[in-house]
């Protein structure tokens, strides 16, 4: 691994989240207006809570997180949480799970993952509802990363996203190994379209900053949870991708 790339990975492993709102001019107000107008029938519970995608695509627990938080174990099941999938593998917004090969043993592994991303990503049937979102990702974000998935999420009044981490069950052993992977680093972008008072996002026992249009770069390998005690819903855009050199440079220049 090149020195500058190694320094980037080490830096991104040191934080549970980072506010990077100043990186780009984000048209969050326009995107909020557009997604709020989407008909309710398109909104679905994340992961495979309302679908047959696991069986249909023969997904396993090594390359994707498949299960709705709280469906197993002692914690309550997440509730009041729905999403719109704008970019995935199939082009069908009902498919809320995206495979993300996260382990790079060699440069060849990285190139194969990148090739897979470029050949297997489609804008879904809901993308027409937010031309502003599509334009922002095509004209701005694509210069800095190859985007793998895009969700708009809505957490209703009283909604809870149960504490969890987004590491596939069969890949958790990699945390103690030497392989290069993207599980325990800043790996997911979280854009708050509208901040509502008393809605808290907590990563690694730390409350994230929140204000209209704020963009948080987060490590979803850390335990995290969200609760909305406001009477109004909160909307966010969540995405992941493979970083280009331009993004790595931007990050290291703004440490």
Where are these regions (language model features)?
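Extracellular structured ligand-interaction cores
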Residues: 147-150, 158-160, 186-190, 198, ...
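Non-heme Fe(II)/2-oxoglutarate
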Residues: 1-144
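A short catalytic or substrate-binding loop motif that flags glycine-/basic-rich loops and adjacent residues
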Residues: 143-146, 181-185
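A short hydrophobic beta-strand segment most commonly corresponding to one strand
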Residues: 187-192, 215-217, 231-249
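A short beta-strand-loop-beta hairpin characteristic of the jelly-roll/cupin
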Residues: 184-211
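Short beta-strand His + acidic residue motifs that chelate non-heme Fe in jelly-roll/DSBH
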Residues: 164, 199-202, 218-230
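A short secondary-structure junction signal
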Residues: 162-166, 173-175, 199-205, 212, ...
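Conserved short histidine dyad/triad with adjacent acidic residue
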Residues: 152-182
């Amino acid at each position: 691994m090149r020195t500058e790339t190694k320094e980037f990975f080490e830096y991104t492993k040191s934080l549970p989240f980072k506010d990077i709102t100043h990186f780009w001019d984000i048209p969050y107000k326009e995107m909020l207006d557009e997604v709020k107008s989407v008909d309710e029938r398109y909104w679905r519970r994340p992961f495979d809570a309302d679908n047959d995608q696991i069986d249909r695509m023969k997904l396993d627990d090594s390359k994707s997180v498949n299960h709705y938080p709280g469906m197993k174990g002692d914690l309550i099941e997440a509730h009041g949480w729905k999403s719109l999938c704008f970019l995935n593998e199939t082009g069908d917004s009902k498919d809320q799970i995206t495979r993300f090969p996260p382990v790079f043993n060699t440069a060849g592994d990285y190139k194969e993952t990148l090739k897979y991303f470029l050949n297997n990503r489609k804008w879904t049937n809901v993308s027409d509802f937010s031309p502003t979102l599509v334009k922002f990702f095509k004209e701005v974000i694509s210069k800095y990363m190859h985007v793998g998935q895009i969700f708009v999420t809505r957490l209703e009044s009283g909604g809870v996203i149960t504490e969890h981490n987004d590491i596939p069950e069969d890949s958790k052993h990699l945390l103690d190994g030497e392989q290069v992977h993207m599980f325990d680093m800043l790996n997911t972008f979280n854009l708050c379209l509208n901040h509502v008072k008393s809605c808290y996002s907590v990563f690694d026992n730390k409350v994230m900053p929140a204000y209209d249009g704020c963009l948080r770069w987060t490590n979803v390998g850390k335990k995290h949870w969200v609760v909305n005690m406001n009477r109004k819903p909160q909307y966010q855009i969540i995405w992941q991708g493979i970083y280009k050199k331009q993004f790595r440079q931007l990050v290291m220049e703004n440490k």
